């Protein structure tokens, strides 16, 4: 089953997608059944979410551009740094004994096909990081590795969009990786019963069509199950929480090649679809010609 959060004239709504996976991944227009929840996060927090997701509802047709972040307001977005062996080597870092965690705020999320706007002060070293995102489906606290996958609702894709110059100002990753509306997240949630390839799936990132990252999740140091075990030993993981599992080799920082104005990052994970975000230098301008601080944006 594939579940999406779709923008509407009144906000957002959760939708169960209809159709074959191959046609979904190649189409610009999608069809689905509207569910009685504002978004996929609200659905996951409802209790027996899998049963609720199968209920009948009104049919809906929408464009891929209408897709919102699949879980727009997670309670936690836990990101994992330095988790692909070859990426650690390209960054000249030591292999960690334990997962390296940092937090991304929900404000950083944007839709899987939304444009990204970066003010001039942040444009010096913009970087892409294609990553597998794991979405929790039921409360997990101090769970063992061998049972950890039972707590997964499903999987999606995230671009851990990074402002490297800001990131490198301190020893902490957070500031450079939580910039407002930069992290494409989606395109939808593929439920765990439909996709179980977390430890063996191809991750491919292109920049204006040129391949930059092309690796397999079997290069992960800490598996999805191990990450859930570790994170849940620190605090409860609740429905809708997201673990972003790290990026493979090929990031722009290692090449000294960064995202330029007007360039498009596309990230595809085998079996999960793709996300595609175009970067623009400067603030977005509304149809009225005003900027983001105008009263019409409040």
Where are these regions (language model features)?
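Short loop segments at secondary-structure junctions
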Residues: 20, 107, 137-141, 161-162, ...
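Flexible glycine-rich active-site/ligand-binding loops centered on an Asp-His dyad
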Residues: 94, 101-105, 147-180, 219-223
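Non-heme Fe(II) oxygenase catalytic core, chiefly the N-lobe of the double-stranded beta-helix
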Residues: 112-148, 153, 158-161
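Catalytic-pocket segment enriched in acidic/His residues
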Residues: 8-10, 62, 66, 87, ...
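Structural signature of FAD isoalloxazine-binding scaffolds in flavoprotein oxidoreductases
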Residues: 95-112, 128, 261-271
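Short beta-strand segments
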Residues: 7, 79-80, 103-104, 127-131, ...
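N-terminal non-catalytic cap/leader segment that marks the start of a structured domain
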Residues: 1-99, 264-266, 286, 293-297
